[in-house]
Amino acid sequence: MKIYNVPVSIGELLDKISILEVKLMNMYGDEKIKNVENERNLLVERCDGNILEHLQEFITINKKIWDVLQQQRDKERAGELDDEFVSLSLEVYHLNDKRFAKKSQINDMYDSCIKEEKHYN
């Protein structure tokens, strides 16, 4: 099996690992779990130093995003595109801003040569 090495920022690496951890908390199916564990393990192997000590912060944010998006999906399936659905959308928006801020903080802390940028008009 071919593996591509792609440069990413340290914040992006931690974010990706944390998303895989959240998937493992919520996923079922042996094959899916095996695939997610494999990807997570490959990424964790690439982590050096003490960067993994920041992983829980990303897991906390991404778990909240997962939970809010699940609530949105449930409401959409039920045809309930109401004020609560809009509130959930705003919550995802704010959580993603928090996630970006955490990635930027980690990138600055470890002097990552790759920096994620956002631009809104």
PLM regions with names:
Residues 1-121:
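Extended, charge-rich alpha-helical interface modules
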